[in-house]
Amino acid sequence: MAKKSDLIYLETNVYEEGLKRVEQIYNSHDEVWISYSGGKDSLVCLKLIEEYFDREGITDKINVLFRDEEIINNAIREFVLTFVDNPRYNFRYYATQLDSEIYILGEKKTLIQWDETRDWIVEKPDCAITLEGIHDQFTFDKHIFGNSNRRCCTILGTRADESLLRFAGITASKVCHITKNPVAKNMTIGKPVYDWHEKDIFKYLYEKDIEYCKIYDHQIFNKDPLRVASAVH
């Protein structure tokens, strides 16, 4: 078993490495999208992409995709909507029927997000894109990108220290920041902040004076985990 003394420290930091990974992702794919959640981790990914575009003088719009899961906290929805009309982004806001699962008091139940056979918890924003039929959330990417011959990457704000499952999934890949997407052969998943800690995330947001979703302030006050993820799976 590896010991702490076996660690090899590099003369770099996660910020510099994050920018390098963003550059590698864009240089090795035909099409790149960031899957934005409104949360702190994907927000950092988005801002790293902006930094990369600015440094390289890239004038293309940044492809941003958001999936509104209907039962998300409204503070998250309102925060995400502030990005929709930003001229820097090609922003796709999806609010469509997705077959998913939710756990209520330890019991697993089926939930169709934005089910057209019932009243919705909240009305869809005017900018929302709705696909025909009901889709599975794990094949959503395939429906959007899987029919293309282009090499596509979806960037996620996944971090290894969030859970052992995520740590195992990241370290199992030969290239930790680019992993295969099991949904389609032409797709990969980019994880430029996989080795960032939560303190690194907030340090970056603070030093760059970047506004984040205010739900985190409430969670800190209540001593809750700092997450924007909904209860659906």
Q: What is each model feature region?
A:
Residues 1-35, 40-233:
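Nucleotide-activated chemistry modules centered on ATP-dependent adenylation/adenylyltransferase
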